[in-house]
Amino acid sequence: MFYKLIKKKCDEWMKSPDCTIRELIQYIYTQNKMRDAQIEAIKIYLFLKIACGNRPLWQLFTEGSFNSLDLTAMELTVEAREILTTNKAAAALLEYSLLTDKNGKQLAPELEKVIKSQSEHINYEDVFKKIFYGVNYTDYLFSLPMGAGKTYLMAAFIYLDLYFAQNEPSNPAFAHNFMVLAPSGLKSSIIPSLKNIQEFDPTWIIPEPTASNLRRIIKFEILDEQKSAKKSNLVRNPNAQKINNHQPLEDLMGLVAITNAEKVILDRVDKDEDTKIFDKEELVKIRIANELRDIIGKIPHLAVFIDEVHHAADGEIKLRQVVEEWTKKHSFCGVLGFSGTPYLEKVENVNLTDSFLIKNTDLSNVVYYYPLIKGIGNFLKVPEVK
């Protein structure tokens, strides 16, 4: 439920003199084309990009970016008060423990007790790194139910990034190019819904003539070729060739490539591993997969969108290994995940102290959550019982 703290701070920012997007948001409301769930997600997205610098969640919470707790009226020991007033990460975790569910029940009363009584034994920065999966790149998850317009929200994020990137081309918070990955377990899913990104009308979120100018610079590539190319000596993977056609890559802006995660996953070996154990056919498959991964890693200012993150399991782990490599090779803007069900298959434990575990049942990197129940009667039909 960390997203509740993010939303609270976002709402404050939207009303503050520091907010630079009020006119843009008002324009989106006036156009009346985007759903409320999508507009709220856009507010969070731009808040994290502009006010928070697109930094990783562990860093934002450690720095106290979402803190609003008044410690002065709270009953604390002298030692706990000293730590909580000087350590922003400690105050952030305490504020999280005080959150309540929809029935008003406190989220984590035992966590509150441990923080107040054993603060001196807790490495808060380390705890936040573990809570957010130990990744050093930006990794935000937007949770919207099916039918909320997730694909058009992806398109909106793409156009908004390009809008701000054109105004501030050297600002690392905004992506210039985008890789959209369909779930690895659903081999037929690329594609028809994600192809709808191409149909999005940017005038719904950005005024003319800017919207049309942005539309002109966008170049869509659907990486769904199954066989290797025969005509090119340099690139044998036809999907890699599609990206290679946009050389010089260092000047590239506006590429939106859509593919299945299966095509980039580290399914067999890395280049450094012993290849003698594979037959020729297997080696060809490995080299073709490596080719696509390598050229994606060279795309500058890249943002990766992962659809249906909850399909996780082994495929998700392998995909994360690939993304890790991309973050090292070139300028990289981060990962955006999208899921209708942001729940873990099993409880994940994070050690707070030697005797206390934080138990997570939800994906912790959710930055925006729109529950299914809110969609029913809004944009989803109420089921009719006969």
What is each residue range found by the language model?
Residues 1-386:
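RecA-like P-loop NTPase motor core of helicase/translocase proteins
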